[in-house]
Amino acid sequence: MLEGAELYFNVDHGYLEGLVRGCKASLLTQQDYINLVQCETLEDLKIHLQTTDYGNFLANQTNPLTVSKIDTEMRKRLCGEFEYFRNHSLEPLSTFLTYMTCSYMIDNVIPLMNGALQKKSVKEILGKCHPLGRFTEMEAVNIAETPSDLFNAILIETPLAPFFQDCMSENALNELNIELLRNKLYKSYLEAFYKFCKNHGDVTAEVMCPILEFEADRRAFIITLNSFGTELSKEDRETLYPTFGKLYPEGLRLLAQAEDFDQMKNVADHYGVYKPLFEAVGGSGGKTLEDVFYEREVQMNVLAFNRQFHYGVFYAYVKLKEQEIRNIAWIAECISQRHRTKINSYIPIL
């Protein structure tokens, strides 16, 4: 017997939840990956993908087929699915889906700003932007000279606007300031998304809060790793960490003081969920920290589908689909470069 909240969930969102579960069922199987890694050329890869749910998505691509073309078409396809979900969603699912696009918007704005700094063609950079993070004012990013310019002229009408309140300054935009801006935006965004999910309650909070806590902790680890050997002070580094997650607050304080990878690993050793991840780095498989974090992310997103009546399945599906796209692009790159020794270093999903 369905309880009241679950019954209302089905009325408002049941169709889309069923649809996204169907999409998840169409992800590539392990047998598909076995077939893909045996392909000799990108044309072979294209032919095999035609036998999967991807169908003729490369039909309009002219020869020669490239990894970039395959990657672009896969992203477009994912974007089409996501836009269908968004166009047919009701509140508060609509707001949840908008939160999902914000990370892609941040990832699009930053390269555009760096490109403007280096006098690169806006059109060239736009071609590399993620379709899920596109917004009308993107092309005007090159007119901004300070974060305040960026906010007032470009981002004030976008979903990113609320996250800029903590990032406003009159500092000139150089490469370091732009990178700091990226991390501050992500911090504000993740904190707001986490608060939204927590306040929503029910199964959505139970599924999404641990996923976002992991994302916050992952960002803290990666920020720390990337700051070694740079001019970023320990105090400034700590201000970039999202203020929630398993590491918050004591782990973040210790992480801010770390001076190398071993000291960072010592912090992770205090947390049962992170200790095995750091132990898996290197070794015979040559895994990077990024690899083990992706593997953990996949596990969490697959588990999200074990629960019903929640928004987390939409987030989980997009993340799993993105990992599938990375996997196919990796295999395609290995085929293209004739570098087959690493072709099996993709991250399995199912």
Curated annotation (Swiss-Prot):
InterPro entries: ATPase_csu/dsu_sf, ATPase_V0-cplx_csu/dsu, ATPase_V0-cplx_dsu, V-type_ATPase_csu/dsu, V-type_ATPase_csu/dsu_dom_3. GO terms for molecular function: proton-transporting ATPase activity, rotational mechanism. Disulfide bonds: none annotated. Keywords: Hydrogen ion transport, Ion transport, Transport. It comes from the Eukaryota. One of its GO terms (cellular component) is proton-transporting V-type ATPase, V0 domain. Belongs to the V-ATPase V0D/AC39 subunit family. V-ATPase is a heteromultimeric enzyme made up of two complexes: the ATP-hydrolytic V1 complex and the proton translocation V0 complex. The V1 complex consists of three catalytic AB heterodimers that form a heterohexamer, three peripheral stalks each consisting of EG heterodimers, one central rotor including subunits D and F, and the regulatory subunits C and H. The proton translocation complex V0 consists of the proton transport subunit a, a ring of proteolipid subunits c9c'', rotary subunit d, subunits e and f, and the accessory subunits ATP6AP1/Ac45 and ATP6AP2/PRR. Subunit of the V0 complex of vacuolar(H+)-ATPase (V-ATPase), a multisubunit enzyme composed of a peripheral complex (V1) that hydrolyzes ATP and a membrane integral complex (V0) that translocates protons. V-ATPase is responsible for acidifying and maintaining the pH of intracellular compartments and in some cell types, is targeted to the plasma membrane, where it is responsible for acidifying the extracellular environment. May play a role in coupling of proton transport and ATP hydrolysis. Regulator of osteoclast fusion and bone formation. This is V-type proton ATPase subunit d 2. It comes from Pongo abelii.
